[in-house]
A protein has these predicted regions:
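Active-site Gly/Thr loop motif
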Residues: 287-311, 398-428, 469-492
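Active-site rim segments in enzyme catalytic domains, especially the processed small/beta chain
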Residues: 109-116, 120-126, 130-135, 288-291, ...
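Glycine-rich phosphate/pyrophosphate-binding beta-alpha loops
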Residues: 316-325, 434-438, 448-460
Length: 492
């Protein structure tokens, strides 16, 4: 067999990333433009974020995969303001963890539709000195008083309609982001906690230019105006979204951040802000079930990362309850088996090979079928990660892929798992939302963090200058299917 170079592997991984982005769900309104995301110590941000807005459809493939390098550090976020905040913290001697917190607090201001302190997140941290990888689970939890019938009426035998469930307090889970960031900072931060809040507080007080992305989403996302606080903040007196470039201030968010900087995460979980959130949720027309006990008992968790060797790299990601790493690794491990002859031949540029694209799509379909059947919250159901990523099992899955045609039907594999015997599968609506950031600092420490308030603009409830999540609608609305329990049903 012909020797396969590292460059071939790198090129294939780059192709996979491009395909992952190209295969994003298209059911939700897509913003017309996106911000260029990368900042390094060797490059300065332009004075205005608008100069970083690029129409991705106008770029050719070479521009889309253009490399960005740095000798010092690298920051990738969804908004130039957040990138600038992270850069500032790094230049002050902060770690990647410090920078990630500063960036996230700014993202909650300038891209509030996607993430914020009213939501949750997952975080991976690589400690370069200790050579250790840690993962943190700060996702929202269901209130203690809800049950599996939160979005289901046993009497009528019907589930709530999706947006009827999303809007208002019923969909709000206990926010977890602040507690997770606080825990991670205690273990990996270098700068004082209060120092990390300065960029976001200053920007909230002084104002920021409304981006085309925010303006577009306010126009396109369904039912954004359903709650008064959102109408007052995001829309002008004529009921139109603030124009692109308009200066938007959020003094209420600034004050919330000041208190969080002074009092720590407890300000969100044990204070008057907690009571404001509970009142907003429980007194809404579509009332929820949050209590003070839900907040005081919330704890972020340290999880075990999921790691495998694939394409000459050791790739790691967040384990359950996140399904991301398990699904991506299964996809890549299947693809690795199918791609090896193509890589060894080296006949044409990998990015131009349609067979590789076909193999990737089919591998992804198989991985998602397993994900939807076997991956859930390990607190409630056993997740057979080792079986799902076993070499023999994935070899058998790869054999199902035909080089000439797509599989007509894709089903989950047959694992000897108690989950398959006790539970059935039922998907949840997949809508675009959420944000991700990646940071590597001067010492080689690295953060990979995904945060969310679930769908765009969350529950449409706004308290303290930030939006509350609608995470509970990420659970399956129906607790059973064909008389078998659904593993992703609502449970406290």
């Amino acid at each position: 067999m012909k020797w396969i170079s590292a460059e071939h592997y790198k090129a294939l991984l780059a192709l996979v990333l491009l395909l992952l982005f190209a295969c994003q769900d298209a059911d939700f309104p897509r913003p017309l433009h996106s911000d260029l995301l990368t900042e390094s110590a060797d490059n300065n941000l332009p004075p205005e974020p608008s100069s970083h807005i690029v129409d991705l459809e106008s770029l050719d493939q070479a521009q889309l995969v253009k490399k960005a390098t740095s000798n010092n550090f690298m920051v990738v976020t969804a908004n130039p303001h957040a990138t600038a905040a992270a850069k500032k913290i790094l230049l002050q001697g902060g770690t990647a963890m410090d920078a990630a917190i500063a960036a996230q607090l700014v993202l909650g201001l300038v891209e509030p539709q996607s993430s914020g302190i009213g939501g949750g997140g997952f975080l991976l941290y690589w400690d370069a000195k200790q050579k250790t990888l840690k993962s943190y689970d700060g996702r929202e939890t269901a209130p203690l008083s809800v049950d599996e019938n939160l979005f289901f009426s046993p009497e009528l035998g019907k589930t709530d309609k999706f947006f009827a469930a999303v809007l208002g307090g019923k969909s709000v889970g206990v926010p977890g982001l602040m507690k997770m960031l606080e825990l991670a900072h205690q273990q990996h931060g270098e700068l004082d906690w209060q120092q990390l809040f300065s960029p976001a507080i200053q920007l909230a007080d002084q104002g920021f230019a409304v981006s085309e992305r925010l303006n577009t989403l306010l126009r396109l996302v369904p039912k954004v105006k359903q709650r008064e606080a959102i109408r007052q903040y995001f829309f002008d007196q004529q009921g139109e979204p603030w124009a692109i470039g308009a200066q938007l201030k959020n003094p209420e968010y600034a004050q919330t951040l000041v208190k969080l900087a002074e009092q720590g995460g407890d300000y969100l979980y044990r204070s008057e802000l907690t009571q404001k959130i509970i009142i907003a949720v429980n007194q809404d027309d579509n009332a929820g079930y949050l209590t003070a006990k839900d907040f005081t008992e919330y704890q972020p968790l340290e999880r075990t990362p999921v790691c495998r060797h694939v394409f000459n790299y050791r790739l790691c990601g967040m384990g359950p309850p996140s399904s991301g790493a398990t699904t991506v690794l299964a996809t890549l491990l299947i693809l690795e088996q199918l791609a090896e002859p193509i890589l060894a031949a080296g006949d044409e540029p990998i990015e131009n090979n349609p067979l590789l694209a076909h193999y990737f799509i089919e591998a992804l379909r198989l991985a998602f079928a397993d994900r939807n059947t076997y991956v859930a919250d390990p607190k409630f159901v056993p997740v057979p990660i080792n079986q799902l990523l076993a070499t023999d099992y994935l070899h058998s899955r790869a054999q199902l892929i035909n080089a000439q045609r797509a599989m007509p039907v894709v089903v989950a594999g047959d694992l000897e798992s108690p989950l398959s015997a006790r539970f059935t599968t039922q998907g949840s609506p997949e809508l675009e939302s959420t944000t991700h950031l990646s940071i590597v600092d001067q010492l080689g420490n690295a953060v990979s963090m995904t945060t969310s308030i679930e769908t765009a603009f969350g529950s449409r409830l706004m308290v303290g200058g930030f939006l509350l999540n609608n995470q509970l609608t990420d659970f399956s609305f129906s607790p059973t299917k064909n008389r078998f329990p659904v593993p992703n049903r609502v449970e406290p």
